[in-house]
Amino acid sequence: MLERISIGVAALVTAVLATFASAQAFDDAKYPDWKGAWDRIVPTWIQPGDKPAPLTAEYQAIYDASLAAQARGEPGNAPSTFCIPQGMPMMMTAFDPMEFVVTPDTTYLLISHVNDSYRRIYTDGRDWPRDFIPTYTGYSIGKWADPDNDGRYHTLEIETRELKTPRVFDITGLPMHKDGQTVVKERIYLDKADRNFLYDEITTIDHALTRPWTVTKKYRRLPSSRPNWISQVCAEANSYVRIHGEAYFLSADGYLMPMKKDQAPPDLRYFNPTRK
């Protein structure tokens, strides 16, 4: 018994010492100053200057149908309407404040969004896992780059795979392919002229696109060095229900309401009273 305890204590001490050594080796001055909270300062959809997504004919038709549905007041392909997490790459196009936590082996990206979204970006030189289960944020591996050759890191280059489907790019419902093979590459860096602005070059490689597609998102550092984060849970305000592919609105008194003109009622056969 004592031998087991000694082994356990030794393992714990080893882990603590390894963490301490890693922290000691972390040269904060070598990394860019991304402290504070960052907020989007342009629209949450494709911003001016970006070229339209080069969608295939099949997925352009899906996108057009989503835009038409939203024009009628329906949710279209927007996943957050039904409490589905935004995930990547949509979470990087949202308007919610975000915060970076940089460590030697991992950069954490915390986003003050519904369900408190976050990302882990591994920068420890690891390879891709063999049996990772796809998630909304995917699996991200990054590396720091020094494009100015001044001995300091300026850019975080990231590749994200293993994204759970269905997936859209932004709130307009721009669709990604359902095969789950989406790859998102990013380059995040500060504005050289004004360190209070941050850019994220997002390149999406996807079979719904005829070629890789790059857009650039811009963020502004918020004035407060101690921002207040608001925790939200989507279920608290979820008023939409999807049944057999059809969306319905849930009224304040708990009744299903149609989302469009002449919409057929949902099939509630299992709720019908049993006839004797």
Which sequence ranges carry the predicted segments?
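Hydrophobic small-molecule pocket/channel-lining residues, especially in calycin-type beta-barrels
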Residues: 2-6, 19-276
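Hydrophobic helical h-region of N-terminal Sec-dependent signal peptides
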Residues: 10-20
